[in-house]
Amino acid sequence: GVIPKKIWETVCPTVEPWAKKCSGDIATYIKRECGKL
């Protein structure tokens, strides 16, 4: 499913720093979605 942009805007400040330190599918997905904002 698609996560609404409003949710990404809320969670990116929290999860993006984590994602940048990690690798793997989930971290890559987070970095890609947060990068679109």
From Swiss-Prot:
Subcellular location as annotated: Secreted; Target cell membrane
One GO location term (cellular component): other organism cell membrane
InterPro entries associated with the record: Ectatomin, Ectatomin_sf
Keyword field: Calcium channel impairing toxin, Disulfide bond, Ion channel, Ion channel impairing toxin, Ion transport, Membrane, Secreted, Target cell membrane, Target membrane, Toxin, Transport, Voltage-gated calcium channel impairing toxin
Keyword Disulfide bond: yes
Main location: secreted
Cystine crosslinks: 12-34
Keyword Phosphoprotein listed: no
MF terms (GO), sorted A to Z: calcium channel regulator activity; monoatomic ion channel activity; toxin activity
Tissue: Expressed by the venom gland.
Function, as annotated: Algogenic for animals, human and insects. At high concentrations (0.5-1 uM), it acts as a pore-forming protein that forms nonselective cation channels both in cell and artificial membranes. It is weakly selective for cation over anions channel conductance is identical in both directions. At lower concentrations (1-10 nM), this heterodimer inhibits cardiac L-type calcium currents in isolated rat cardiac ventricular myocytes.
Subunit annotation: Heterodimer of an A and a B chain; disulfide-linked.
Family: Belongs to the ectatomin family. Ectatomin-Et subfamily.
The name this protein goes by in its record: Omega/M-ectatotoxin-Et1a subunit A
